[in-house]
Amino acid sequence: TGPPHSMHLIAKELHKKFNIPWIADFRDPWTDIDFFSELKLTKRSLKKHHKLQYQVLTEANKVVTVGWDWAKGLENHGAKDVAVITNGYDFNIEEKLRKVELSSDFTMSHVGIVGAARNAVRFWEALGELVKEDTLENFSKSLKVRLIGQVDNSVIETIKKNDLESYVEIIPYIPHEEVIVEQSSSHVLLLFINNSPNAKGIMTGKIFEYMASGRPIFAIGPTDGDTAIILNKTKSGVIIDFEDKEGIKNVIVDLFNKYKENQLVTKNNENVENYSRRSLAKEYVNLIKKIVETRQ
């Protein structure tokens, strides 16, 4: 499993020496990762990266990654028929999550780091406009946004610019056990995708814990990316494009109206269970069995 992708090079040598099956599992891309272009590489080093990547992708018995967009990228670099086995959630948390009582306020929460690349500017603008317009009865009185995790200064400045300081609570750190309780008491779970060139392939591990809670997910990101595929497959939420401010406003209004009508209920969706680590482990077992069988 990589990164670090040096692990694949170790596996490559073991595969050669002992003639044993080799699965190269990419939790993140190699040369397509978003910060790769920022590395201070010489032409020789860049060529070496691509050469080693090609060797790994073409010599492994099977290449696996966590999303469909990344699978296409790896195939473009030489891999054949890349298998997609996504990240998932720990099935032991499901019952604990579902016993949590909802907040009385209309609470939208984001769990995890909100860096500069995750500054959903149009979301904050839409929220600020809805508060100022004051056309939704009790919206400003009920609204509460919680950001649980580190928040970049650029995000804080955007919040201030839209006069939302009194509606947003930033909680820098709480233990994981408390995090899952906090997210399950929220009416809506926010997911901000990095606004970067590889945004289509970004599918944070957090989305799976979100799905396990059964709370509706509101994501900001590419509507044709891997996160959109997962949300559509599981009917766990909605995703709106980074720049679609009107679309964002419409979703917030719809969610708030459902909150008022007590319709933001916790959903038990059997499709979500396919993304428990137990189910995903079975997928991996089947993959390993196939590889072993083809060698016999």
Regions found by a protein language model. Give the residues of each.
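Conserved donor-binding/catalytic core segment of Leloir-type glycosyltransferases
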Residues: 101-118, 124-128, 280
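Carbohydrate-associated surface elements
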Residues: 69, 85-88
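Acidic anion/phosphate-binding donor-loop and adjacent secondary structure
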Residues: 36, 89-104
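Membrane-proximal helix-turn-helix segments that form the acceptor-binding/catalytic region
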Residues: 6-17, 30-31, 43-63
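Acidic donor-binding loop of glycosyltransferase active sites
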Residues: 61, 167-169, 183-200
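Nucleotide-activated donor-binding/catalytic signature segment of Leloir-type glycosyltransferases, i.e.
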Residues: 135-149, 153-178
